[in-house]
Amino acid sequence: MSLLPRATPAAMGVSSRAIDALLDRLEENIEPHSVMIVRHGHVIAEGWWAPYTADRPHLLYSLTKSFTSVAVGLAIADGLLRLDDRIVDVLPGRVPPDVSAQGHRLTVHHLLSMTAGHPQDSLTEAWELEPDDLVKGFLRVPFTTPEGTRHTYDNATTYVLARMVEKVTGRDLPGLLDERLFAPMGIGHAEWDRVASGAAFGFHGLHLTTEAVAAFGELLLRDGVRQGRQLIPADWIELATRRHADTRHGDDWANNPDSLCGYGYQFWMSRHGYRGNGAFGQQCVVAPSQDLVVAVTAAATVEDSMPGALWDCLLPGIGRPDPAGDDQRLADRLKRLSLPPVTGDAGPGRSATAKIDASQDAALPEGTVITVDPMPGGGWRLRLGESVTVEAGHGGWRESAPLGRPVVTTAAWRGDLFVADLYVITTPHRVRLTVDAGTGRASAVWSTVPLTGPILERHLRAPLMTRPDVA
């Protein structure tokens, strides 16, 4: 069942040629996986680059933070949490004995706005200090600026928020959002990556379909009301999507003018509205002045490619609809979107064996034995060590789920080289596997290295679970 109604671009006053230009820009600058454009509450353009599909949830990375913000807003609306509540009061059992005076003062507001006072993202150091409890680790990392004075993008702040919400509501974060947000929206497929205790990261790890992301943006645009029901408090949306911190000092964002517009409560401000933003190009962009929502999933290595492409390509087409023939040409293009399968030959029809010569951030450990066997009727069976076996198609893709999560693979021979692309299809990431039948050497290299580590086997398990931690 669709979450949003459909219409043509012209019917909603948008140029299909402008959307066409946006598709061109995305394909030139990033590896796009999906796009959905919503105007006046109607989907006017939607497409998935094969092998990605409409029904497949996609890892959102830090776009997850915007959903955690909603959970905080629900807890506040229920009277269970306040913006000035302190970490030490809500989670007293997770406060280290040597917590600093500044750590004592940190509140929900400081966490939401990422103005706790750490000089940089504290996540890695916090986990090194307290491998079993990130909350304690976060409070032990030294603060270098007074709270509330400087924004530093800090993943651990959102983790602490998630634990605070769980403490005051008595619900785990996924369960709370399933009941209060996703189920009323008609979303039943949300999946969360977790730490080893089973707790959701909160700052990343949510998987949703592109339409679910777009429907979330549309819900924000409608002040939290869906089908006459108030799912998110309107005053929370207004507060969360307002600037609370200046980001103009952030050198990391210097190439992206939208990232200099400020930070709200787990939302980025933008030149024409606001957005939820995730690594490698996961985007939910809301432009209230244009009654517009755009959802994108991708494997982007150029982080400044979005949302600038929307403003450059799409905004000039607002209020300038094109003839019906142009709408149809766009619809035809959207149906044919595809990433390129591996090119090369279907033969020779022989097996090959090689061992991984691992580089830094390789997807498979050094010495992993790779076996390539032709299959009756075409394609290949690939054995990657002892625990992972997948099938690969020629000129297309074949799907396998060796450890729970699907991987979709395309391959071909290029002389003595066997080349395969393994798409971890619920994420932005793929692995380029190369087997040299002549030398017996192989490599497995990520197109973009997952932020949760390079080992492929980990990303094929559902749910992905990393890091020790207490519940």
State the predicted function of each range.
Residues A18-T53, D291-A295:
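A short, well-structured edge-of-sheet supersecondary motif
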Residues G41, H58-D84, L111, L161-V165, ...:
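Active-site SXXK
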Residues L59, D78-A116, R140, V168-H204, ...:
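Active-site helix/loop module of the DD-peptidase/beta-lactamase fold
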Residues G117, D121-T152, T158-R194:
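A small/polar active-site loop signature that marks catalytic segments
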Residues T157-M164, H204-V225, Q282-A299:
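Active-site-proximal alpha-helical segments within enzyme catalytic domains
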Residues E238-V294:
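Active-site Gly/Thr loop motif
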Residues G278-S338:
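Structured C-terminal helix/loop/strand segments within mature extracytoplasmic catalytic/sensor domains
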Residues A324-A471:
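Peripheral terminal and inter-domain segments
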